[in-house]
Amino acid sequence: DCLPGWSVYEGRCYKVFNQKTWKAAEKFC
C-alpha cells in the first residue's frame, strides 16, 4: 500500500508527476 496521493506502478509507489519526470520519480523512490 502507498501513501495517499501516491500511485502503485509495477510494485513501486509513485507520486503524481508529469510523464517527463517519471525517471526522476524512480530516483526519488
Swiss-Prot record:
Q: In which tissues is it expressed?
A: Expressed by the venom gland.
Q: Which organism is it from?
A: Echis multisquamatus
Record's subunit section? Heterodimer of a metalloproteinase subunit and a regulatory subunit comprising two homologous polypeptides disulfide-linked.
- Tell me which residues make up the C-type lectin domain: 1-29
Task: Say where the protein is mainly found.
Answer: secreted
- Cellular component, GO, one term: extracellular region
Q: Where does this protein reside within or beyond the cell?
A: Secreted
- Which family does the UniProt entry place this protein in? Belongs to the snaclec family.
UniProt keyword list: Blood coagulation cascade activating toxin, Calcium, Cell adhesion impairing toxin, Disulfide bond, Hemostasis impairing toxin, Prothrombin activator, Secreted, Toxin
Q: Which InterPro entries match?
A: C-type_lectin-like/link_sf, CTDL_fold
- The name this protein carries in UniProt is Snaclec multactivase regulatory subunit
Instruction: Say what the protein does.
Output: Multactivase, a carinactivase-like calcium-dependent prothrombin activator, activates prothrombin via recognition of the calcium ion bound conformation of its gamma-carboxyglutamic acid (GLA) domain, and the subsequent conversion of prothrombin to active thrombin is catalyzed by the catalytic subunit.
One annotated GO molecular function is: toxin activity
Presence of keyword Zinc-finger? no
Detail the disulphide connectivity of this chain as listed in its UniProt entry.
Answer: 2-13
